[in-house]
Amino acid sequence: MRTFAFLTAMLLLVALHAQAEARQARADEAAIQEQPGADDQGMAHSFTRNESAVLPLSESERGLRCICLLGICRLL
């Protein structure tokens, strides 16, 4: 009976250890994905509408610009 209890305890410890390693691997992977890469930093995109566009612009649309920085866009 002691042997059975010992084997059961060992099996549970091995299972818990494997589960802890899997959780740690997922946490490490998530931390790596959250860190911005060197090529992502400082990258900005700016879009402006050409004055010679096919459709004429109204007074309120003149000078309308969109600036996107790190996935966040805003109109100026």
Curated annotation (Swiss-Prot):
Origin: domain of life: Eukaryota
Q: Decide whether keyword Signal is in the record.
A: yes
Mind telling me where the Cyclopeptide (Arg-Cys) (interchain with C-73 in subunit A) cross-link is?
A: R65
Output the InterPro entries linked to this UniProt entry.
Alpha-defensin, Alpha-defensin_N
Signal sequence extent: 1-22
Entry keywords, A to Z? Antibiotic, Antimicrobial, Defensin, Disulfide bond, Fungicide, Signal
- Subunit structure, as described in the record: BTD-4 is a cyclic heterodimer composed of subunits A and C; disulfide-linked.
Q: What does this protein do?
A: BTD-4 has antimicrobial activity against the Gram-negative bacterium E.coli ML35, the Gram-positive bacterium S.aureus 502a, and the fungus C.albicans 16820.
Q: What is this protein called?
A: Theta defensin subunit C
Species name: Papio anubis
